[in-house]
Regions:
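Helix C-cap/alpha-to-beta connector motif
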Residues: 1-4, 10-39, 55-66, 93
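Short, contiguous acidic/charged loop-to-helix segments that flank catalytic cores in large enzymes
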Residues: 2-8, 77, 130-135
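Short, conserved glycine- and acidic-residue-centered signature motifs
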Residues: 12, 83, 136, 140
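The catalytic core of metal-dependent phosphodiesterases that act on cyclic dinucleotides
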Residues: 35, 41, 51-130, 146, ...
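Glycine-rich phosphate-binding loops at beta-strand->alpha-helix junctions
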Residues: 40-46
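C-terminal helical cap(s) of enzyme catalytic domains, especially alpha/beta-barrels
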Residues: 169, 185-212
């Protein structure tokens, strides 16, 4: 509803500010944390986005590298050059940028060399079935290799069990998210979870230990 109405831009700015504020609080309490926010396609067309973002980071004294913005491939379709210019300005601040749900949109691979990206997030559509589908396993493996060869990190979505986690570890996947790693939590639950180091699985392969998606 918000996406098709007029609420999505102010709502996303509000969520983004709250995320930066929460990030400041967690880091002040000693947690090594990165927060990721989904970026609305409409907000990606807002020329004021870099200014607002810089204001939030400055006001709450947060290192820009501690914030990551997730962009869907579809969000880049309407005006790719305009979106690219805005993302370049955000990248210049030091904010991390990632493509969310990689492999399910309509964009070209050419975007990977034109955008200032830090990471790809491979969609759960492929990850959740990789133990049962040879095609999905090949797609996941190829995407991991593609990201690494381009100097990007890779995040796997939809890690629902230990088998998938082990397979991703074997492929060299950098980070993971899903119910096997951690279910949605409140702010206080996240603090307890991080303090207990539940994110460190046996074998030394870490999921998104410092990576908390917020919106």
């Amino acid at each position: 509803f918000a996406e098709v109405g007029e609420l999505i831009v102010p709502l996303t700015y509000r969520v983004m500010e709250k995320a930066v504020q929460q990030l400041h609080q967690w880091q002040a309490e000693g947690f090594r944390t990165t927060v990721a926010c989904n970026l609305s396609p409409r907000l990606l067309m807002d020329d004021d986005l870099p200014r607002h973002l810089e204001g939030f980071l400055t006001h709450y004294q947060v290192d820009p590298a501690s914030l990551e913005l997730e962009i869907t491939e579809t969000a880049l379709i309407a005006e790719p050059e305009r979106a690219r210019e805005i993302l370049l300005r955000i990248h210049a601040m030091g904010v991390r940028l990632s493509i969310d749900d990689f492999g399910t949109g309509y964009s070209s691979l050419a975007l990977l060399k034109r955008l200032p990206l830090h990471a790809l997030k491979i969609d759960l559509l492929f990850v959740s079935q990789m133990l049962h589908s040879e095609q999905d396993a090949v797609i996941v493996s190829s995407t991991v290799n593609l990201a690494h060869n381009l100097g990007l990190s890779i995040v796997a979505e939809g890690v629902e069990n230990a088998g998938i986690q082990a397979a991703l570890r074997e492929l060299g996947c950098d980070e993971a998210q899903g119910y096997h790693i951690g279910r949605p939590m409140t702010v206080e639950e996240i603090k307890i979870w991080l303090a207990a180091d539940h994110w460190l699985p046996a074998g030394g392969w870490a999921g998104p230990s410092h990576y908390v998606a917020t919106a």
